[in-house]
Structure formats: structure tokens, C-alpha cells
């Protein structure tokens, strides 16, 4: 029942760690593609891809998905909404700005991402994590 996703600035660390092929890495950098990775059942998988020079479109997509869950009354507010990041101050500020009027500033908790996220995703990775009332996979 945890929704945790990250938008990744560069696929360099995914490539170095063997998580993506050389061709994927090359095309991703050439066309400024940023993967949005979702953690499901303890495994990282690509949820979607966004294009752009920075993380803005990816952050917007994650926030829109949160707002969809919020409008469906599927967010469990007995837990904080976490914003894990790896040196991603811009992304943290953007997510906080988008969500503070919706959920309140006290519910938002920026945290440093774990070592696994740091190693696989690299710098400027920003995530959004929250608890759901109903599991996404049950639908």
C-alpha cells in the first residue's frame, strides 16, 4: 500500500549499475528522457518516461498522480507524505509548492533518499512517497 516513485535526472548510474543497456542510455541522454521509477514489491521498475531538459515534467507527472489518488480519497493521511531526494532541492521545493495548499505543510516530509536510491539513480533524483488506503495493484 506504499506508493513510492522517483524521477531520475540522468540514466548514467542506471547504465553503470547494469540496470539499462548502452543503447537505452545513449538514446535517453540524446533525447533528454527522464525515467520515472516506481518501487513495487521491493523492486524498481520503470513506470513512465518524460522528456525535457530538467525534471519539471517528471515532477508534475508524479504530483498529478498524487492528486488523482487524493481526489479518489485513496491517500492515508495517518502517515506523512515523504519527498525523498538525492541533492534535489529544486524538485523538493517544486513538490512542496504544489502540495502544501492541498495537504498542509506539516504533512510534507523532505528526507534524504537511501543509499540504494543514491547508487542506482544518482544526483538530482527526487521522489514522492505516500501510503494508500487501497493498493494500486488490487484495482
Spans of model-derived segments:
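Mixed-charge interfacial surface used for oligomerization/domain docking
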Residues: 1-139
Amino acid at each position: 500500500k506504499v506508493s513510492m516513485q522517483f524521477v531520475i535526472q540522468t540514466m548514467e548510474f542506471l547504465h553503470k549499475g547494469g540496470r539499462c543497456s548502452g543503447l537505452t542510455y545513449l538514446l535517453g541522454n540524446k533525447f533528454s528522457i527522464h525515467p520515472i521509477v516506481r518501487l513495487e514489491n521491493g523492486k524498481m521498475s520503470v513506470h513512465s518516461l518524460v522528456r525535457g531538459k530538467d525534471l519539471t515534467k517528471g515532477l508534475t507527472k508524479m504530483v498529478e498522480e498524487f492528486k488523482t489518488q487524493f481526489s479518489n480519497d485513496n491517500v492515508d493521511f495517518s502517515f506523512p507524505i515523504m519527498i525523498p531526494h538525492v541533492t534535489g532541492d529544486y524538485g523538493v521545493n517544486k513538490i512542496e509548492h504544489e502540495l502544501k495548499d492541498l495537504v498542509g505543510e506539516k504533512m510534507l516530509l523532505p528526507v534524504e533518499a537511501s543509499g540504494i536510491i543514491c547508487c542506482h539513480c544518482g544526483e538530482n533524483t527526487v521522489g514522492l512517497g505516500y501510503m494508500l488506503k487501497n493498493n494500486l495493484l488490487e484495482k
